[in-house]
Amino acid sequence: MKIKINNKEYSFNKGDTVIQVADRNGIHIPRFCYHDKLSIAANCRMCLIEQVGINKPQPACSTPAQENQEYLTKSDLAISSQKNTMEFLLINHPLDCPVCDQGGMCELQDQALMHGRVKSRYAQEKRVVIDYNIGPLIKTNMTRCIHCTRCVRFGEEIAGIKEFGAIGRGEGLEIRTYLSAAINSPMSGNMIDICPVGALNASPSHMKGRTWELEEIKSVSAHDCIGSNINMHVFDNNVFRVVPRENEKINEIWISDRDRFSYEAIDHNDRIKKPIAKINGRHIEVEWDQAFEIIKEKLQNIDKKKSAGFISANSTVEEQYLFQKWLREIDINNIDYRVSQCNFENQDLEFYPQLDIPIREIENIKSLLLIDSNITYEQPILAYKIRKAFLKDAKINSISSYNYEYNFNTNNNLLVNPNSLSDTLIDIIEYLSHITSSDKKLKSFNIPEHVSKHFKGLTNKNIRDISNDLLGHNSLILLGSNLKNHPEFELLKVLVNIISILTKSNKGYLAENCNELGAWVTGCLPYKNEVISDSKNSGFNADDSIKAMLDCYIIYNLEFIDFYYNNELKNSLENAEFVLGIQSFVTEDDRSLYDVILPLATVFESPGTFINIENEWQNFEQGCTPHYMSKEGWKILTKLRLMHGKEISISHDYVDLLNEIDSIARKKKFSNSVQPHNIDIKKNLESFNLIRLGGVNTYYVDNIVRRAPSLNKVDSNKNIVRVNKNTLEKNNIDLTKNKVIVKQGDNKLLVELVIDENVSDNSIYIMNSNKEHFDLGKQYQQITIENV
């Protein structure tokens, strides 16, 4: 089909609007309300054009392209209409461009220059709009607002959380939150990007710099397993702000608030500025050479079989590769990145924690089963993809111990106690084994006896509905990242694998860190190096290394609260002969347990590579040179390898390091399936009267995010416990009081009580939002509650 624009013929597809055809062919049409990721509003009228044969101008954004029609974007009628619209928009717009954050990248400035009048005919006073506080992330200046409603539509359509709305009429119209509430969407910062004027600005960078002074540097998000592409805006060797970088395969044009504002942590008070060593019982700052000499001397006298190394799954591929390489060269095989995991049964069975399908294909799935995942806040970009699938009528179900609030609707929310999670999955397998027995392709798969012996012979309606939905074409099962703390994690992976076989579903584990696949590929595991699994030289896993009370511990880019057994770890470190930390940040309490701390550059100050959940290797650039006396991780680890006199093939050049890793690991293929016949079913989760639930707060997931001031102000009321009414009454809790005491072992905490029917029976939900919550005790363990 063909249309004419400005006397030239162009092809178009059915359903295209004129502005879409024009954009594809490089024809400029001004616009404010139109955005290709949002629905059409047609309320700014800036895109008015002439349709030949019609006397009135037409909005190009909402006018459907019609075959054999002719449109003019530069006729006298179109130009006059655009100038008139611009004049109306500028009537009330303040002339504060020199102090506006949007200055230099403002759509209104650009359009006014190209389509505005030279002189204004309006001489009256301009209106002024009150600025409401909508939270710590977005600074408003609503006098500049031109009512394009992009922010309103973003909340409704993309974030799935309707928080902004238009209140009033005419000149009194205001864009604001309902009841003057704060914005809580984990993707709210994207409204700053799509705002065409300076009405919505990033609070941390407000009034601190000009657009033309900034250098744009490509990078990758380091706070979830999606690997969103970002641009760092750098000025004077400081990250000034972070914005999305378009990548349609992964994050499209959006990023989470966690990715956008975490850069604030770079110069936090906990930042390690120089190497630190404990000398004569006191921690003092030393030079790099002195620190390396102390490390060399200490490691020479340590029993390597009684030493262990832990590295963050948020570290780069390069750091992970060099870390395990260095430790194995000095005969330390107790290496692990799985520090938040507590169940390591059958760990040497190959399990590559990747997604079976590309991220971009999630929006096309027909059915989804979420297992204990707070995905809206844990993985905001992935939740957006699922929301797109929901809007295409995908059937979504969840099984969890807490009914999380999603930005999409679900068919079934099956609420189960953590003790019953594996039993629920076995019930699904039992039902599926009956209804798939007539399928010739599935007949060859026999349910393992150690699974079938747990069949009960009864299934409820929710189990049947969830199972039937999965049997449809193109289904997906996702295991939430919080399950890594579950004592039956290995068993749950096996059961999910059986369900995926019976339903021909794709599956995936939502890793809690950005580079778990990198840690797996590079061999940061006790049973494999970067090339092969090697059970003969297998070392201790993280759990065993901590409980073994070893002589030496080396901790890379991890804080103690990142460990599942954090209290046990502290006890082991207190009794160790030597503890080395390679860290960007350290608290005063943690500092006392280290003998040497080397200052590590943050992810913003170092180049590197992350492997996301779909096995996409993504390189990123160094945003700024390391602050203070910190160094890039790959340089520190290369120095440590050279210091021990090993013959190494790697040079000091970063490119050579990339080539070495690429030749060894990049082309290897791995499986994320766990063979169900190899694992026995064991109930590792004890039956407690009360069991503790709760993942990690989305703004407390790693050592950078938890130090970003603005992010930590988002949810000010963090010290709360959630329990349902039935559980409270069974434990004789006074429902008229708003404070209770919770206890785990010898630790106790005074918290605010919230009665919440979304919590499963005999469970207490405490989100880990501060150090006190981590120190209280572990998830999925016994907890008690009592009156104050």
Predicted regions: what they are:
Residues 474-546, 693:
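A glycine-rich, hydrophobic/aromatic-adjacent loop/helix-cap motif
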Residues 236-253, 258-268, 272-277, 287, ...:
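Long hydrophobic segments that form regular secondary structure
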Residues 200-206, 239-241, 305, 309, ...:
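Acidic/polar loop patches that form or flank catalytic/metal-binding clefts of enzymes
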